A protein has these predicted regions:
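Catalytic-pocket segment enriched in acidic/His residues
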Residues: 26, 35, 43-47, 63, ...
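N-terminal accessory regions of nucleic-acid-interacting proteins
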Residues: 116-130
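Short, structured patches in soluble enzyme cores that scaffold and shape functional sites
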Residues: 80, 105-107, 111-113, 131-136, ...
């Protein structure tokens, strides 16, 4: 099943995609209700509205090798703020003070039920589904030690286009990032250092995650700069493609 959020007549709604139509979510199970419109004609929002966004760094073998970093003993974690969230086809805004803005294509895990002290082997029971994300980073702010600012500026967490619930094996997905149509990142989620179960178990020992919260699972090798006018796409097999443009914030 694919869940979306959309904007219609000035209001946000939640829907289920059936073929090329979006139906209202109805009832306690969130199943399809009346038809809202065609998927291609609706303005999609981020498919979830998380209270908490927990992110894993240095979690792909390719990126660790590329950067010459030591293999982490525990998942390196950081947070992105709620205001960073934006949706598919929206604009990523580069602050005027930022000289180098970077893309980081990632698999996002969307939480489906309250998760606290989750055993790694039961992680799937707490997951609603998966979506594409771009962990946008202001490289120069990160390097001066201001990680919160570097990761959490407005529009620095695009997600979408929808939440895909029917993923049999999230450890066997292909992440591809394109910049202006050129492939700049490509790696399998099987190359994660810490799998989704390990990450969720580690995070929820201290942080309770609620339905709609998000766990970003790290970015493959090939992280690089993007500039105003660029179109950046994050495609994940079995899910879809998240597409955004870059512009100056002014």
């Amino acid at each position: 099943m694919r869940f979306v959020r959309y904007s219609l007549d000035g209001s946000a709604g939640r829907g289920v995609v059936v073929d090329d139509l979006v139906h209202e979510c109805s009832g306690g199970n969130g199943g399809p209700g009346r038809v809202v419109g065609r998927l291609a004609e609706l303005a999609l929002l981020s498919p979830c509205d998380p209270r908490t966004i927990v992110c894993a760094g240095s979690n792909y073998a390719g990126q660790i090798a590329e950067k010459g970093r030591p293999w982490p003993e525990r998942p390196p974690l950081f947070l992105k703020s709620h205001n960073a969230v934006t949706g598919p086809d929206s604009v990523i805004l580069r602050p005027s003070e930022v000289r180098r803005l970077e893309y980081e294509g990632e698999l996002a895990v969307v939480i489906g039920r309250t998760a606290r002290d989750v055993p790694a082997d039961r992680a799937a029971d707490f997951v609603l589904g998966y979506t594409c994300a771009n962990d946008v980073t202001a490289h120069d702010w990160r390097d001066d030690g201001q990680w919160t600012r570097a990761k959490s500026a407005d529009t620095f967490c695009p997600m979408g286009p929808w939440i895909e619930t029917d993923i049999a094996d999230p450890s066997a997905l292909r992440i591809t990032t394109r910049l202006g149509g050129r492939v700049v990142q490509e790696e399998s989620t099987s190359d994660m250092v810490f799998g989704i179960g390990e990450l969720l178990a580690f995070v929820t020992r201290w942080i309770t995650l609620e339905p709609g919260d998000v766990l970003l699972t790290g970015s493959p090798a090939g992280v690089g700069p993007m500039v105003p006018g660029d179109i950046v796409e994050v495609e994940i097999s079995g899910i879809g493609t998240l597409r955004n443009t870059v512009a100056d914030r002014g």
